[in-house]
């Protein structure tokens, strides 16, 4: 099996893997309470709810 003659630098590794990581797109879902787009498994920053529970107090 081929082995590298020298250690690949961090920049080489990151630039090689950049193509792989750019293939992932960010998943966005609608908040069930207010309908605003939010990241899944996160508290909605618009209304402060996570599922049925209010986690953040949002001043209006």
Swiss-Prot record:
Q: Which GO terms describe its cellular component?
A: large ribosomal subunit
GO molecular function terms noted in the UniProt entry: structural constituent of ribosome
Keywords from the named record: Ribonucleoprotein, Ribosomal protein
Q: Which GO terms describe its biological process?
A: translation
Show the coiled coil region(s): none
| Origin superkingdom | Bacteria
> Which family, according to the similarity comment?
Belongs to the bacterial ribosomal protein bL32 family.
Question: Per its UniProt record, what PANTHER family does this chain match?
Answer: 50S RIBOSOMAL PROTEIN L32 (PTHR35534), LARGE RIBOSOMAL SUBUNIT PROTEIN BL32 (PTHR35534:SF1)
Q: What is this protein called?
A: Large ribosomal subunit protein bL32
């Amino acid at each position: 099996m081929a082995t590298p003659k020298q250690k690949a630098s961090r920049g080489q590794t990151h630039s090689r893997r950049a193509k792989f990581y750019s293939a992932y797109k960010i998943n966005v879902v609608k908040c069930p309470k207010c309908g605003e787009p939010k990241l899944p498994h996160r508290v909605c920053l618009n209304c402060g709810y996570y599922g049925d529970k209010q986690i953040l107090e949002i001043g209006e």
